[in-house]
Amino acid sequence: MWKKLTTYLTLISTLLVCSMFFCSFASIIGPEGSTVKIMYYEKMPYLVMMIMLLTGGLFSILTHRLPFLQARVCMLTGLMLIGFQIWLGVDFFNYRNDMVFSLTMMFPLLAATLEMIASRRALVDGVTLQALKLSKRNAGVMSSKTK
């Protein structure tokens, strides 16, 4: 499981999404200089999206023995992360004058990049495994023909 780069990339991506549960989304500066932090989990749509992304990342890690399925799950998770990033960007442009946003808003973009790279690596692993199986089968056929 821990021998493939795909697993590490997906794990880092999943940890980035998981860290968003503990980070603040934005801060609102009050009239007397007091700040109110808004966490990601306080907004229900963000919470649902992060749970879906966390589930996708964990499922991708656990499907390490099936590289084609892992590639599909990584690609789907990456696309969901891009959608989440667009959603965060829309909120940023809507509330940029009222709130001070956290740098953690860029985590989905970084995680999406890692997921896309992991998807590509999983496809390469799958094709390599298929080629290895095919070459072993052809080697067995060739050795039986020479006898």
What is each stretch, according to the model?
Residues 1-20:
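Cytosolic juxtamembrane helix and N-cap/initiation of the first transmembrane helix
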Residues 15-43:
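Hydrophobic transmembrane helix segments
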Residues 37-55:
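Interfacial helix-start motif at the membrane-water boundary
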Residues 58-71:
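Juxtamembrane helix-break-helix junctions at the cytosolic face
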Residues 73-90:
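Hydrophobic alpha-helical membrane segments
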Residues 99-126:
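Alpha-helical membrane-associated segments of multi-pass integral membrane proteins
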Residues 118-142:
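Cytosolic juxtamembrane helix at the C-terminal end of the final transmembrane segment
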